[in-house]
């Protein structure tokens, strides 16, 4: 959600903070602010409603401070106002926060803090509490404060009488940190300081970190020293830049062939799926009674494709659960149940809490995540890292396709281990999977034609996506992409369900994107298309036909390269991504930063 950065060292802090916030802006862009130590020892704050560029307009050009904290906000408590923007300063304390303090009302009453508050935020309550408890010992005060707090939080804190120092502590909400030649860095995401260091560690929960220009020290709540566990990424700052593209989203669409190759290649040996490098033994895939996929948003829709594949091709009972629902229900799991958790960031709060619940019932938990060392990855029994590189655009593209590719690898392994698939069948399946990057490259060349057809879409208020089987699972992601970046109400329906209510919404000119790549239900989908066309729908048909002889069934036909049915969805999703992207830009919108959305949902 919110973006956090802190720095203390030998460089100008303001430049590092504002550059870092710009890199984190996908996590929130309602308001932005920084706090820093002045030469006088006082803490100065600059904050404003708007984006980082608006913050830069009010920053001090001659600011030579070398210690400060910065924040870009996605509003959860209180409206989008200057008073509610971070950092918050109360007395001796300046503080930034990502998370939600659930008992802030009780804290206000218990410590009589109302008179010291000027905002509507739970964050300012935390700052006021720390200031109230402060006795000159920052770490002791922070320990007392966090003992009072309920909810999730990641805090960076400065005390007026501790110049050059930043203190940090977290629960649930993640922060990464490093120390290098330039100084000490902390942030909610590595992209904020990748320019300075590719090494990082994840701040452990309930560990208090003290940052100075000379180093980093950590201790737990009992005062025991904690050593950082450093990791290193294999990408650099250029991977988090647009690199000549107008938006991150279109860049990341083009990166999908490479991303999929990086996901599948290390896990294929002799044309068969192999998870040795992930330290996952074949025994993990044995004696599986059922599979539950738990995720949110796009990751959940990747799971829907996984479900369709695993159930229909490999005969495995699969359910897909929304993480925010699963975590509050009584799970029906046994020690033979496999539960797969999908999250690009590895920090999605509902998915993480669902994992913690599932771990009480089964030892067969597997996560599919992109960020190495993330909390979900660490707490799963096993993890598949997708190696997709940073995804900056809020609307996910390459994270989705690599998650789907991961399900294909898992499905093939399960098919082999269970005996439902022969080695020769598995080799053919994997060889087809290896061709997916080439298929995507071919589809991307159709981008100019997609841009032209979306000119008809920009004036739409509603749109519908239909398909059957894998195509229906794919359609859910297509509809999500369109609605989140173009603000057109879009829904996906199983094509056979149209007559059970949805067809009442079809009227003259309403766009219907029909996906028909599954041979065994192709004729059925065509019949459903005729039904919506008869009601005046503007039909865009995606199919593997080179040409449509009956031109009356659609207004636009997008021909996809020939591919086995199971793999055609990789082609279709690229078209859906391009439709969403060009519809958004055609409306003059910024697809990278859709309203009200943030990239990593780390609060409930």
Residue spans of the language-model regions?
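Generic C-terminus detector
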Residues: 538, 553, 563-604
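Catalytic-loop motifs flanking and including active-site residues across diverse enzymes
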Residues: 122-125, 302, 306, 402-407, ...
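Glycine-rich phosphate-binding loops that contact phosphosugars or nucleotide phosphates
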Residues: 286-435, 515-561, 579, 587
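Glycine-rich oxoanion-binding loops at beta->alpha junctions
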Residues: 50, 66-83, 269-282, 306-342, ...
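Active-site phosphate/pyrophosphate-binding segments
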Residues: 256-260, 264-292, 382-511, 584-604
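Conserved short alpha-helical segments that host acidic/polar catalytic motifs at enzyme active sites
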Residues: 1-242, 246-247, 258-289, 301, ...
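Acidic/histidine-rich
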Residues: 152-183, 453, 458-484, 526
């Amino acid at each position: 959600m919110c973006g956090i950065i802190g720095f203390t060292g030998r460089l100008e802090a303001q430049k590092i903070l504002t550059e870092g916030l710009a890199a984190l802006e996908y996590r929130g862009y309602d308001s932005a602010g920084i706090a820093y130590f002045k030469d006088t020892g006082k803490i100065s704050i600059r904050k404003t409603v708007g984006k980082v560029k608006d913050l830069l307009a009010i920053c001090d050009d001659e600011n030579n401070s070398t210690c400060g904290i910065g924040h870009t906000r996605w509003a959860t408590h209180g409206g989008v106002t200057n008073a509610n923007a971070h950092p918050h300063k109360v007395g001796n304390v300046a503080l930034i926060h990502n998370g939600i303090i659930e008992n802030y009302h009780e804290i206000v009453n218990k410590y009589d803090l109302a008179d010291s508050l000027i905002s509507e935020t739970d964050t300012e309550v935390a700052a006021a509490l720390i200031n109230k408890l402060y006795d000159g010992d920052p770490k002791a005060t922070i320990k007392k404060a966090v003992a009072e707090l309920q909810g999730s939080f990641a805090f960076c804190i400065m005390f007026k009488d501790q110049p050059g120092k930043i203190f940090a502590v977290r629960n649930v909400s993640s922060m990464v940190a490093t120390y290098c030649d330039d100084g000490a860095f902390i942030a909610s995401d590595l992209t904020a300081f990748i320019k300075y260091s590719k090494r990082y560690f994840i701040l452990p929960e309930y560990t208090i970190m003290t940052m100075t220009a000379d180093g980093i020290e950590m201790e737990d709540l009992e005062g025991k020293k904690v050593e950082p566990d450093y990791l290193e990424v294999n990408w650099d700052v250029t991977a988090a830049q647009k690199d000549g593209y107008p938006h991150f989203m279109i860049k990341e669409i083009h990166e999908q062939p490479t991303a999929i190759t990086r996901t599948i290649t290390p896990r294929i040996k002799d044309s068969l799926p192999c998870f040795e490098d992930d330290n996952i033994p074949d025994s993990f895939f044995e004696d599986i009674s059922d599979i539950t996929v738990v995720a949110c948003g796009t990751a959940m829709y990747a799971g829907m494709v996984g479900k369709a594949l695993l159930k229909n091709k490999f005969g495995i009972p699969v359910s897909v659960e929304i993480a925010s629902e699963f975590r509050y229900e009584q799970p029906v799991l046994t020690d033979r149940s496999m539960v797969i958790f999908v999250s690009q960031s590895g920090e999605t709060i509902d998915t993480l809490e669902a994992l913690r619940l599932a771990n009480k019932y089964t030892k067969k938990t597997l996560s599919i995540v992109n960020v190495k060392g993330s909390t979900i990855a660490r707490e799963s029994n096993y993890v598949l890292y997708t190696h997709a590189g940073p995804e900056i655009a809020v609307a996910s593209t390459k994270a989705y396709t690599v998650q789907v590719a991961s399900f294909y690898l898992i499905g093939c392994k399960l098919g082999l281990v269970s005996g439902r698939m022969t080695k020769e069948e598995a080799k053919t399946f994997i060889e087809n999977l290896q061709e997916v990057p080439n298929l995507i490259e071919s589809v991307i060349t159709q981008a100019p034609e997609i841009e032209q057809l979306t000119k008809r879409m920009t004036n739409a208020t509603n749109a519908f996506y239909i398909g059957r089987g894998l195509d229906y699972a794919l359609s859910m992601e297509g509809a999500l992409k369109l609605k989140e970046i173009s603000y057109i109400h879009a829904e996906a329906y199983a094509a056979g369900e149209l007559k059970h209510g949805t067809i009442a919404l079809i009227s003259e000119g309403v766009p219907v994107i029909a996906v028909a790549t599954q041979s065994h239900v192709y004729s059925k989908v065509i019949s459903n298309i005729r039904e919506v066309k008869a009601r005046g729908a503007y039909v865009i048909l995606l199919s593997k036909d080179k040409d449509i002889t009956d031109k009356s069934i659609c207004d636009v036909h997008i021909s996809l390269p020939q591919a086995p049915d199971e793999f055609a969805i990789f082609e279709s999703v690229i078209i859906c991504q391009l439709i969403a992207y060009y519809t958004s830009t055609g409306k003059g919108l910024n697809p990278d930063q859709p309203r009200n959305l943030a990239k990593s949902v780390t609060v409930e």
